[in-house]
């Protein structure tokens, strides 16, 4: 097992010079909203964001996690250029708060965000964000200390677990699992005997915090679960894709003004991402090496960690109980760009039952059906799916609906 300092050192990488994480950013986002964060500029786009909406160059912001794989592969393989777009080198940031800030301020005009974040941005902060496609499915898990004795979610009673962001699929799925197990999630102070204390922690800090005993577990996107398993003595408790079948996690977002002003630009960007996702499905290990430290260096993580994070979903996990729904035929991470309305509706409903810091009053009375229509602009991905026959059933409208499945 690596020492906590060694785990942190994995993130000492040249790209950190572009990391604008600030400790108070998350609090500003949660308590004051985007208007407060951007200097009280009201609900209008900042000048920089307006400039981004007028910029033909694709400017990608991303967290160095496997959630960003499709965007990174589209860049690495030249799919944006082949679609007729100019693209800048993708910019990595260290935390969700930094990515939200960069997108809101106009530093990026294309990004991946955890699906609950654009819900919060659009309906709490009135920020004109639109979802263009899903970035991937599954791709997350909850890990605990290998010698913790924690065998299920009931075992998290009295424990402390880190989540990457209050408005995240991780927080939604974790709190669902805790409630189903009779454990009460709390977000302030220590956990009581029948409670699990949740705290925000940037993904790069999670494995080291677990190794140091500062937390009892964490739920996050890959490759931090794989890193925890390989370097921090962690054990996979459960994959999120084994709780919510093929759930969305990150989605591809753009500014509504960019889409309105340049619909052809949006369509070409989605074409590139759909092509990239098809490539990822067919070339999992190659893609893992490509985005790793030994490849293009999009992720400052060794190839063995990224390969495990994208391909290791086998019998050992069934034996340990991390996989309990083998019949779902899921993958550790998978790629499917269509934004099923049923999933958006369920996310909005689940957010209403999820404890977060700050004012979540905007969720009261928020109609899930309206959100599914208003937040998502699916015309581009619908056209892209039909343009690329690699996607089975893409030409059949019946394949564009599904029933959501949750089971602990």
Language model features with spans:
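Pocket-lining segment of extracytoplasmic ligand-binding domains
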Residues: 115-117, 192, 205-305
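Secondary-structure end/capping motifs
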Residues: 260-362
């Amino acid at each position: 097992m690596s020492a906590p300092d060694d785990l942190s050192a994995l993130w000492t990488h040249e790209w950190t010079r572009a990391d604008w994480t600030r400790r108070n950013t998350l609090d500003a986002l949660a308590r004051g909203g985007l208007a407060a964060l951007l200097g009280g500029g009201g609900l209008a786009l900042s000048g920089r964001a307006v400039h981004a909406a007028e910029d033909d160059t694709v400017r990608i912001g991303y967290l160095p996690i496997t959630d960003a794989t499709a965007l990174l592969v589209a860049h690495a393989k030249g799919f944006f250029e082949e679609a007729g777009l100019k693209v800048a080198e993708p910019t990595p940031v260290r935390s969700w708060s930094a990515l939200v800030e960069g997108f809101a301020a106009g530093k990026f005009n294309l990004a991946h965000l955890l699906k609950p974040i654009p819900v919060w941005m659009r309906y709490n902060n009135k920020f004109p964000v639109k979802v263009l496609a899903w970035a991937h499915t599954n791709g997350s898990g909850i890990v605990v200390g290998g010698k913790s004795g924690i065998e299920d979610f009931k075992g998290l009673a009295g424990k402390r677990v880190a989540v990457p962001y209050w408005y995240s699929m991780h927080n939604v799925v974790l709190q669902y699992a805790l409630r189903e197990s009779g454990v009460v999630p709390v977000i302030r102070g220590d956990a009581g005997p029948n409670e699990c204390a949740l705290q925000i922690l940037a993904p790069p800090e999670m494995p080291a915090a677990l190794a140091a005993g500062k937390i009892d577990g964490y739920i996050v996107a890959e490759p931090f679960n794989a890193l925890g398993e390989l370097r921090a003595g962690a054990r996979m408790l459960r994959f999120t894709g084994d709780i919510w079948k093929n759930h969305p996690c990150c989605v591809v977002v753009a500014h509504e003004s960019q889409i309105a002003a340049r619909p052809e630009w949006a369509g070409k960007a989605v074409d590139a991402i759909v092509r990239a996702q098809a490539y990822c499905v067919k070339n999992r290990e190659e893609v893992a090496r490509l985005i790793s430290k030994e490849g293009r260096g999009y992720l400052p993580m060794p190839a063995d960690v990224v390969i495990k994070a994208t391909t290791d979903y086998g019998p050992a996990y069934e034996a340990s109980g991390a996989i309990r729904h083998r019949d779902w035929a899921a993958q550790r991470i998978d790629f499917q760009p269509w934004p099923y309305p049923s999933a958006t509706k369920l996310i909005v409903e689940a957010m209403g039952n999820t404890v977060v810091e700050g004012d979540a009053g905007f969720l009261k009375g928020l109609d899930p059906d309206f959100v599914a229509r208003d937040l998502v602009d699916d015309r581009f991905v619908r056209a892209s799916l039909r343009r690329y026959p690699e996607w089975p059933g893409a030409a059949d409208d019946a394949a564009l609906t599904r029933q959501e499945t949750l089971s602990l």
